[in-house]
């Protein structure tokens, strides 16, 4: 019986054995390479998520308070830890919602808004080419007002509809309340641009 089994096995020469060995080694190498690539991709994805959460919040714009600078549906990237100056866009949380507004003034500045919606800081009218339309909007803050230290006075670019520092519902934004300085619009691709 054992003789017949031995006779039924094909005889392989050295070249065939070497070819089979190369094929098996190639399959192992290929499987290891695929596994390595998948692990690297998983690591890159985890790092990207951590970076987005810790340093680079990505936000989708809802509403029209920042028209024409930002439109509803735009996606922007903010950077945590950057100091904001007048004219910069920042994101901050109010009542559990992340908002994006423009910094108009910082701590110690005096802000006034006239009946026509012209904004002045420290007595000088601002040149605001980004404003959708000048309007006083909802304003229940006494003007002129002094911006408290370590806070920002913020406004939306579409003044007629924006709820911002002119309203006690939002008020002054503490520096530690900000989630980041908005630096880049990434969507839609046709409007990709730096925003600082």
List where the protein language model places each region.
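Soluble "head" domains of membrane/secretory-pathway proteins
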Residues: 2-32, 54-60, 68, 72-196
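Hydrophobic membrane-insertion alpha-helices, especially the h-region
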Residues: 35-53
